[in-house]
Structure formats: C-alpha cells, structure tokens
Amino acid sequence: MMPAKLQLDVLRTLQSSARHGTQTLKNSNFLERFHKDRIVFCLPFFPALFFVPVQKVLQHLCLRFTQVAPYFIIQLFDLPSRHAENLAPLLASCRIQYTNCFSSSSNGQVPSIISLYLRVDLSPFYAKIFQISYRVPMIWLDVFQVFFVFLIISQHSLHS
C-alpha cells in the first residue's frame, strides 16, 4: 500500500497539473479508490489537439511519478499519436503506458473501462466515471466535432 505522505504528494501534483491546462479532479477520494490498481489520465482527442499543452503537462507529471511507479500503473488514454511518439522515451522511463482507444479497437484490445461506454461519446465517460471537469466547456468539443464532420463531407462532395 502506498504511504499516506506519497498519496498526498500525488494529489498535489494532480492539482498542480490541472493549473497547467489539463483536467481538475473534483473527487478527493479518487486516489483512495484507485491506488491499488491504476491512475488513468484521460486526454480526449480534441482538447489534447487544440487546448492542452500535453508535453508540458507530461513532463511535469513524470518528474513526480518516477517514485510512484511501484505503486501505480499509470495509463494515458486518447493521447494524439504525435505526442506519444515524441514522448515515448519519457513515458517509458516512468513506466507510463499509452493507450489510444481509437486505434486499440483494431487489434481487439479495447480498454475495459472505456468499453463501459460508447467510445465515441466521450462526455459521459470523462465527466461521470472519473468526475473530471475540463476548463474547456464540453459544448465547444461538440462544435469542433460538427465542424470537422462538415469539413470532411464538404471536401468529399467537392471531389465527387
């Protein structure tokens, strides 16, 4: 079991990371419920691509999580591939696993937690399961998704 002081340190790190532009943990019991198994960081595709300084956040977290590695399996979901490739050595050195739930379906290994919800409907997964709130309102994510779908359709119709 992880020492209480280390738990507190990790919680402070998470709160500090939230100020760097990633998620804010609302539920202080998060570590109590997950400390025997894993900590999961969810970076939905659109916020990670447009709003979150992913590299800065991960470097900040990795500095702290080297000492936590024996106690946690740290997983990142939905990290855009370009960030994962650039940060592969950093992630490996801290035993951080990277899972992209969109590409994982190709080999049939969909993460069990994510499979509880439809993988395209990100809002209930991120908002309810982990009680995480993002600084970017969810409505903006919907606007971006609609915009990109419209863009793809319009490009397709132009070529046909």
Swiss-Prot record:
Gene Ontology CC: membrane
Topology relative to the membrane: Multi-pass membrane protein
UniProt subcellular location: Membrane
Cystine pairings recorded for this chain: none
Alphabetically ordered keywords of this record: Membrane, Transmembrane, Transmembrane helix
Broad class of the protein's primary localization: membrane
Regions crossing the membrane: 39-59, 136-156
Domain of life: Eukaryota
Family, per entry: Belongs to the UPF0479 family.
Further details from the record: Completely overlaps YBL113C.
The protein's name: Putative UPF0479 protein YBL113W-A
